[in-house]
């Protein structure tokens, strides 16, 4: 005989492991597959883009690309997107943008990448200009390898346009509130599996023993995979529009309520909000400090990775391994993050990220500044040189900082909005997104690129002590902001509970 208690237990356990109803699989699985394909491309692009720029132009060029090319390109892309939405149906907008990326990947794979000498200016001319105009030498070197700069920009835009905008807009449009509670967490878990899968694919395609194509075309199979993945995204989206959005059990436009538009604020209004509200200002400082501190360490780390892995293939394989660890750590933090939030105070949970950043950042810079001492005492024990150890510590720092962001940092930041009154909560969040989002993502790149313009003789080797000093100042300000916000947060929470 079946035991009812055991049956109930197994039923509850299955809901925890797979909270999707059987009939909902028709809707959930294609969406999860779409997100997996988008993230597969995203993580592959992230590994490759740095390999091309760092090894062919220099690690210093990344900060210039982020500040002067990626940022304006993102603004232009958003303007084009808004215009497309005015003249086309939402479904067709998706096809146009995805097809544009697919077309670019094909162009790069079969024209720009195989024939760099035909599309790039003469290297000697570029070098002579760089010597003649040292303050703008990084701009000149970027122009000299413009196809790699364009690839870097498109890689950055893929994450913004395809994942943050098109996929989530589609998901929010067709997902009911009760479905979202079960679907979205599962999306995160399944999609993060794309990162370790990317690592395996990159490791195989670029391995010296793998002979799929000629040696100088090693990256072509990866580009073919990205083109195929983009095509599968289009096909899946088309299938969902034909088969899911026509199924009344899975999609009813009347039940999926129109979401309220988020409050949008101008840059000036955002500054006013942040400077007039200490509480909102603290939250903005958290976001800015996170973005700047991550970028400052990441730039130095990538320059060290280049020293250790000087070829495109070796560098990209290493970045693939980085994606592998990042994927599993992100999944682990997603699973344990909610438990940490339930068992500790807001202050403790919010303090974990800056303290982790401080400790790992200090260890990373210590391995750079005291490499000769470390080489004397630890190399024999650990069987690795100081450069390899510095790169390893830098990878740990980057993996943890990104893993913690999606679980603890974002969660504690969003919790801080809850005690605010409705008006301040809506306007404050919009202000933080404008100021914190823009200055957090580009702040570190602006600091680094400005430094290299003012001091053209400096590279990352000479600039590291200055960037390290700025890093520690930023993290200390971050800790101060967490403590200050906690005082304000406790006062508001106590008021709302009374």
Swiss-Prot record:
Membrane topology note: Multi-pass membrane protein
Pfam family, one: TLC
TM segment ranges: 34-54, 68-88, 93-113, 148-168, 185-205, 219-239, 280-300, 321-341, 349-369, 380-400, 439-459, 466-486
Predominant localisation class: membrane
Residue sites binding ATP per the record: 436-442
Keywords, ordered alphabetically: ATP-binding, Cell membrane, Disulfide bond, Membrane, Nucleotide-binding, Transmembrane, Transmembrane helix, Transport
Subcellular location: Cell membrane
Listed GO MF terms: ATP binding; ATP:ADP antiporter activity
Cytoplasmic compartment spans: 1-33, 89-92, 169-184, 240-279, 342-348, 401-438, 487-498
Cysteines paired by S-S bonds: 37-85
Functional description taken from the UniProt entry: Provides the rickettsial cell with host ATP in exchange for rickettsial ADP. This is an obligate exchange system. This energy acquiring activity is an important component of rickettsial parasitism.
Protein name from the UniProt record: ADP,ATP carrier protein 1
Originating species: Rickettsia conorii (strain ATCC VR-613 / Malish 7)
The organism's taxonomic lineage, starting at the top: Bacteria, Pseudomonadati, Pseudomonadota, Alphaproteobacteria, Rickettsiales
Gene assigned in the entry: tlcA
